[in-house]
């Protein structure tokens, strides 16, 4: 059985030679150089991912939704009843939630994973990786033990890698859990060094008169637990949650296979910050789908050095933004593989020479 450290060491670097070849190929297509903007850069990034073997393409698509409850809900940081987590997870098995509709539209399968729902019995139809019935209340204790965090990371990494073996080449991450923007804000504040007041938002429509309490809860959680910002596992274990750990595991698992993973919203940014502390190499495999409307979103993305492709003012979570952006990935692959070449039409654009086109 591989350890977490073993798996982290398997994450390959992006192939710069493959990216250079892709750049030359794209520059020779039937268009002015650079005229397809970020689609070109995206195709080149995909070409460099070893799991795609130098040719941008999309096989099977999967959105993995990590579902868990949070002890910090007890602090009054969310207005939705805690039971909504289990109810919505069950709705996902019926295909009726936002992510399910958008994933179906994109031709992706949704994998709903119970990593910590607070229900008496497992919910039929969910993938059962439950660690406990909800995480600890981070305002008064750690979210979980380091051992629990490492085991869940390893389990999710292995599950993700198994999906890759079965033909999935594009992953999306999502989550479900009442009060989970509170631990996400704690992670973002810890790793970026920004004050909780700068990153704590309203989540699922928290009334503004309750925002000060939420900020105070995040500040207390960080002060009490003292997470080490350089240690992603420590941050997740002390002020995170099982859903956040699970998302980090998907990112690490996809990257270990040399495959892309679409981020979703604020929760996924927090998980990505922690995952990048464990393995900086994974950042090259992360594709930011959209800009979350949550307050700390720009701070988290700026720290990651990522620019989102969409700005739809969304803050649903669930993996909805990741599913929505999947056609953009397919479009980048399509231009790379299906457009004609300048040389074949005897077109020489200013700045190009015949030898350039034939190289």
UniProtKB/Swiss-Prot annotation:
**Active site feature:** 318 (proton acceptor)
Gene3D superfamilies named in the record: 1.10.1610.10, 3.40.50.10210
Task: List the catalytic activities from the record.
Answer: 5,6-dimethylbenzimidazole + nicotinate beta-D-ribonucleotide = alpha-ribazole 5'-phosphate + nicotinate + H(+)
Q: In which pathway does it act?
A: Nucleoside biosynthesis; alpha-ribazole biosynthesis; alpha-ribazole from 5,6-dimethylbenzimidazole: step 1/2
Q: Which UniProt keywords apply?
A: Cobalamin biosynthesis, Glycosyltransferase, Transferase
EC number of this enzyme: 2.4.2.21
- Supply the enzyme class, top level: transferase
InterPro entries xrefs: Nict_dMeBzImd_PRibTrfase, Nict_dMeBzImd_PRibTrfase_bact, Nict_dMeBzImd_PRibTrfase_N, Nict_dMeBzImd_PRibTrfase_sf
User: Biological process GO terms, please?
Assistant: cobalamin biosynthetic process
Molecular function terms from GO: nicotinate-nucleotide-dimethylbenzimidazole phosphoribosyltransferase activity
The record's listing under Pfam families reads: DBI_PRT
Signal peptide annotation: none
Q: Which family does it belong to?
A: Belongs to the CobT family.
User: Per its UniProt record, what NCBIfam families does this chain match?
Assistant: cobT_DBIPRT, PRK00105.1
Q: What does this protein do?
A: Catalyzes the synthesis of alpha-ribazole-5'-phosphate from nicotinate mononucleotide (NAMN) and 5,6-dimethylbenzimidazole (DMB).
Subunit structure, interactors included: Homodimer.
Q: What is this protein called?
A: Nicotinate-nucleotide--dimethylbenzimidazole phosphoribosyltransferase
Q: What does the organism's lineage look like at the top?
A: Bacteria, Pseudomonadati, Pseudomonadota, Gammaproteobacteria, Enterobacterales
Gene coding for it: cobT
